[in-house]
């Protein structure tokens, strides 16, 4: 026989049971940070990771970041996966004086970034974004065309939030087929990334693939602890590659360069505008050469024609913004097209013998040049881009000094004291010029001493 509980006790137990076991489960405090259980209705395409370890990492990071939204307002955001995450909350202290926010999650994909973009990044109203993403998509067998589709959506959301916000798009780092990230697939993805942003002045592509790739187009063990994640030396190399671009964007090195030329030398660049510099008419031979190149090669560089001389006296930048003066640096910025052949020249010529000294700093694989009266001495990220790739004293992504001594119709050229050219042929007179081609090149302390 079933015994019945007294009515007051039964009512109390029912009430307690109702509280302890609600018919509809209440959402957890972390539900807003969780990965959606299915892909239904989610933006983008391709893999979204849902392994238990990844979900825990995702929730933990996003919960911590939500508590820092007010503190991280107007930071430069580093956005990505474990490579970014592993750099630490302050990016290893690599950018002193710059407010940064690390928004990398280990294991994330382009689609994962797209899902969390609004809360993790846009809510901070960032001054800019440094983006490195895509390697985990490759491991999960996503096709490069799918991955770049997600990149386009990410960029569209960033631009919708702030059309003028600068974005530094880092090429996917090399890895290894042993890590399910073969070189040919990474290269294809990087090609598509570059094509997706071609012509966009707000996006600067940084060649971080050439920065790291070894002779086999893989990640070197000396810089990557597991052929995927950089070690301390690898992060230092990435930071050095970023600094020149961040300086051009106005985030670093904002103070003028305090430099006084040696006795007998005269500055050709005043450090704050392009007075004394301009564009000269494009020679007919260059026009014809450009036409032949562009007709035969769909990937040929843009090569704008200058019809008449243009002076930039008093201007902080050339009319197209490619050449600009900032804090003592004459910058040849990365062209939105990826490559664009141009030449900025002094408005005066130099018929007398002279010694020309200047310093330059190149982003990875950058290609520029110094015109000596007319012919061009290649000035590049030499160890990657050549042609002087055996230099022992060249300092990648740091300042290096070029000295050019002209006697008659020949020039001796050195870099940090190492010989580049013993007798480089030059004409009797002509200007000093700086070429723009690929990547970013900065020049400073440009001075000349005319000899008797």
Which residues does each PLM region occupy?
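Charged, glycine-enriched surface loops/patches
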Residues: 148-170, 187-188, 192-203
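Catalytic His-Asp segment of secreted/periplasmic serine-dependent ester chemistry enzymes
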Residues: 174-253
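Structural recognition of the beta-strand scaffold that forms the well-ordered cores
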Residues: 75-79, 100-104, 128-133, 166-171, ...
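N-terminal secretory targeting modules
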Residues: 1-78, 84-85, 89, 93-94, ...
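Acidic/histidine-rich helix-loop elements
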Residues: 40-53, 88, 96-112, 139, ...
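Oxyanion-hole/transition-state-stabilizing segment in secreted/luminal serine hydrolases
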Residues: 84-101, 110-152, 157, 168, ...
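Carbohydrate-interacting regions of secretory-pathway proteins
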Residues: 152, 252-452
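Solvent-exposed loop/turn segments at secondary-structure junctions
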Residues: 82-86, 106-110, 135-140, 173-177, ...
């Amino acid at each position: 026989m079933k015994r019945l509980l007294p009515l007051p006790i039964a009512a109390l137990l029912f009430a307690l049971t109702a509280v302890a076991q609600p018919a509809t489960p209440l959402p957890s405090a972390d539900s807003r940070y969780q990965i959606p259980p299915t892909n239904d209705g989610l933006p983008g395409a391709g893999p979204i990771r849902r392994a238990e370890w990844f979900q825990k990492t995702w929730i933990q990071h996003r919960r911590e970041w939500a508590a820092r939204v007010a503190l991280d307002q107007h930071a430069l955001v580093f956005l990505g996966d474990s490579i970014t995450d592993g750099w630490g909350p302050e990016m290893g202290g690599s950018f002193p004086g710059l407010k940064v926010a690390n928004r990398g999650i280990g294991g994330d994909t382009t689609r994962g970034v797209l899902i969390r973009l609004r809360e993790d990044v846009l809510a901070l109203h960032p001054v800019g974004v440094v983006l490195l993403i895509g390697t985990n998509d490759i491991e999960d067998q996503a096709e490069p065309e799918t991955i770049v589709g997600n990149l386009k959506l990410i960029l569209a959301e960033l631009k919708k939030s702030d059309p003028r916000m600068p974005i530094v798009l880092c090429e996917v780092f090399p890895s290894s087929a042993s890590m399910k990230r073969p070189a040919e697939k990474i290269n294809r993805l990087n090609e598509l990334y570059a094509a997706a942003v071609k012509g966009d002045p707000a996006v600067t592509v940084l060649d971080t693939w050439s920065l790291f790739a070894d002779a086999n187009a893989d990640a070197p063990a000396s810089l990557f602890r597991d052929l995927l994640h950089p070690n301390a030396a690898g992060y230092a190399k990435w930071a050095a590659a970023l600094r020149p671009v961040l300086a051009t964007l106005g985030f670093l090195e904002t103070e003028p360069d305090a430099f006084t030329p040696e006795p007998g030398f005269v500055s050709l660049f005043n450090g704050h505008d392009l007075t004394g510099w301009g564009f000269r008419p494009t020679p007919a031979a260059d026009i014809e050469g450009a036409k032949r190149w562009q007709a035969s090669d769909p990937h040929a560089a843009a090569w704008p024609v200058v019809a008449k001389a243009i002076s930039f006296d008093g201007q902080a930048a050339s009319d197209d913004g490619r050449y600009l003066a900032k804090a003592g640096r004459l910058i040849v910025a990365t062209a939105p097209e990826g490559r664009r052949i141009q030449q900025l020249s002094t408005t005066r010529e130099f018929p007398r013998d002279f010694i020309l000294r200047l310093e330059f700093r190149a982003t990875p694989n950058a290609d520029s040049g110094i015109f000596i009266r007319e012919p061009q001495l290649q000035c590049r990220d030499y160890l990657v881009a050549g042609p002087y790739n055996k230099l022992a004293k060249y300092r990648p992504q740091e300042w290096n000094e070029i000295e050019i001594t002209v006697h008659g119709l020949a020039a001796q050229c050195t870099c940090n004291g190492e010989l580049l050219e013993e007798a480089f042929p030059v004409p009797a007179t002509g200007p000093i010029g700086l070429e723009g081609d690929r990547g970013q090149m900065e020049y400073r302390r440009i001075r000349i001493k005319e000899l008797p």
